[in-house]
A protein has these predicted regions:
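Active-site nucleophilic cysteine motif
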Residues: 33-52
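A structural motif
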Residues: 10-22
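Active-site nucleophile-His-acid catalytic modules used for acyl/amide transfer and hydrolysis
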Residues: 19-38
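A general structural-boundary detector
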Residues: 4, 31-32, 74
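Soluble non-cytosolic domains of exported or imported proteins
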Residues: 4-11, 35-40
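Surface-exposed loop/turn and secondary-structure junction residues enriched for glycine/proline
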Residues: 28-30, 42, 57
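...with weaker cross-activation on analogous glycine-rich loops/strands in unrelated enzymes
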Residues: 14, 46, 50-130
Length: 130
């Protein structure tokens, strides 16, 4: 659940994450269309960004790292991406297809994760204003 003071599009992002948070991991999932039966890492991040009105079409991890948003961390949403993986922090919660070392929250596919993960090797990006 998004904080009560979160902007409407951030609340929409959290709702979108909730809608797919138990879908299976499918390589390439979410790239032909935002609506899919499974998602890979960047497909899941794309789905949530689209729901927030921050992305027009699905984007692979590499371009997320190089061309989406502005460098740095946002107040509400930060995307962490490199050439082979992407995940995001939305309203303080990590949305990731990888457990990232969280042994208490296993499972592949998009999941809200409580534990932070190592950020080395990732580029932090945000949408200005968010």
């Amino acid at each position: 659940m998004a904080p009560a003071d979160a902007p409407a599009n951030i609340q929409a992002a959290v709702a979108a994450g909730n809608a797919i948070h138990t879908f299976p991991y499918v390589w390439g999932g979410g790239h032909r269309s935002f609506t899919d039966t499974g998602y890979d890492c960047s497909g899941a991040v794309s789905y949530v960004l689209h729901a927030a009105g921050l992305l027009a079409s699905p984007m692979p991890s590499g371009p997320m790292a190089s061309s989406w948003g502005a460098p740095g961390m946002g107040r509400w949403i930060t995307v962490y991406a490199n050439a082979s993986h992407a995940y995001m922090i939305v309203a303080g919660l990590r949305f990731d297809t990888s457990s990232g070392g969280d042994r208490w929250n296993q499972g592949s596919g998009p999941r809200w994760r409580k534990k932070k993960r190592q950020m080395g090797g990732f580029t932090a990006k945000y949408a200005p204003g968010y």
